[in-house]
């Protein structure tokens, strides 16, 4: 079990079966699903969907391919999920994605969670480049990434399907040399062997 924390209002912890009900309760919202991408995020979202995702995340982590975390408040309440995918060890890059339950929006939890994940990616995984793709309508997420030092690298026309229409995506990236966060962030329980580190 990995835990990533600081003195922030949230901490990250590896997903576990006990998170299923909280994930389902927070994910079962059309606006949350739309922000993630409805082509691979079901709506409605039930406990069985959460269980399937936790199982998938556990397998991908064991194979050293992805790392997904619950975003928890200091009292343990799970408010969202974020993770690393498209992990390219040879080129030391990945893509991140995240969502927060709607009732927890606009509290800074997403920002702090991404800060924790950046430290994990750049230091624990020795990545050089971290990317995020944000749908064109998601101005809040764009602002979050820009505020953390990500740079926009361009618009991807008709990036994702939404019903019979297509949504543009915007690519954001941060390079390790531009990473400036000096907060004291602790990573407990991580085994770098799982991710092919030397």
Go through the PLM ranges and name each one:
Residues 27, 36, 61-62:
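Hydrophobic residues in alpha-helical segments
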Residues 1-31, 68, 73-198:
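Acyl-donor (CoA/ACP) binding surface of acyl/acetyltransferases
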Residues 55-70:
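A short helix-loop-beta-strand connector motif used in the catalytic cores of GNAT acetyltransferases and
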Residues 33-56:
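Conserved GNAT-fold acetyl-CoA-binding loop/helix
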